A protein has these predicted regions:
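Non-catalytic alpha-helical scaffolds and adjoining flexible linkers that form interface surfaces
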Residues: 1-251
Length: 251
């Protein structure tokens, strides 16, 4: 295939209106990482492409190089993950998975590990009832693949191994602090040993092993809050999907 065209498998991260009838797509592809592409006429009622280009659809695409960005010439749905569209809560979690990847990545080439994590996570949301494990596992392994793995085994300030007691976490320093260091370093927040134990377990385990963990509700809430704090620090802004998830969970 010439350098004027590209065939990829990709997940649609988001789309927006472009011109009078077109749609601008943000894609994450297996072959080329993050891409932007225009789907000509996708907003027209009779467009054959429109149904293949909705967010969290996995789609096979043929792209042609335009003046400034790729143009979609063919689109064929591989998996629409329909159950994720039938529940507002699952829609929210799927949107969070996409938004997190979208905010953290740029158009910088292939990353097969990230693409596989994305596909695995969408499939897990379809079949696994414990969405907490799916999402926390995704967050931790996404951070790992992006080079932001939080250090959870030794104090990031003094280097001493973590002892079986409550500790501190500092987002700016990228990991856990022992009680002595955490108490005197600004920006540190307490974290229980139970939360650290399960976060470390998720980091080093397979998804199947993580799914077997029996995690108390209070510890789940603490893990979610700590990862949200760390991710918000890294992105320097909040995300939209968590507020939607909270709203539909309360309704």
């Amino acid at each position: 295939m010439s350098d004027r065209s590209l065939r990829v498998e990709a997940v649609v991260l988001r789309h927006s209106d472009w011109g009078e009838a077109d749609r601008l797509l943000s894609l994450y592809s297996r072959e080329a990482g993050k891409l932007r592409a225009v789907a000509k006429g996708a907003r027209k009622l009779r467009s054959r492409k429109a149904g293949h280009l909705e967010p969290f659809t996995r789609v096979a695409l043929l792209l042609a190089r335009g003046r400034d960005m790729w143009i979609v010439t063919q689109a064929d749905t591989q998996d629409a993950y329909l159950p994720l569209r039938e529940s507002l809560t699952l829609t929210g979690y799927a949107a969070y998975v996409l938004e997190l990847l979208d905010r953290f990545t740029y158009e910088e080439g292939q990353n097969a590990g990230l693409y596989q994590l994305l596909i695995d996570s969408l499939e897990r949301l379809v079949v696994v009832t414990d969405t907490f494990v799916v999402v926390r596992y995704y967050e931790l392994h996404l951070l790992d693949l992006l080079g932001f793995r939080p250090s959870l085994t030794a104090c990031v300030n003094c280097g001493r191994p973590i002892q079986p007691q409550d500790q501190f976490f500092n987002a700016q320093m990228g990991g856990v602090l022992c009680p002595d260091c955490g108490a005197r370093i600004p920006g540190s927040r307490p974290v229980s040993m139970a939360a650290l134990k399960y976060l470390r377990h998720f980091q080093r385990s397979s998804f199947a092993q993580a799914l077997r963990a029996q995690i108390p509700d209070a510890t789940r809430a603490e893990m979610e809050a700590l990862l949200s704090y760390y991710i918000t620090f890294l992105l320097e802004r909040g995300l939209n999907a968590p507020a939607f998830i909270r709203k539909v969970s309360q309704d």
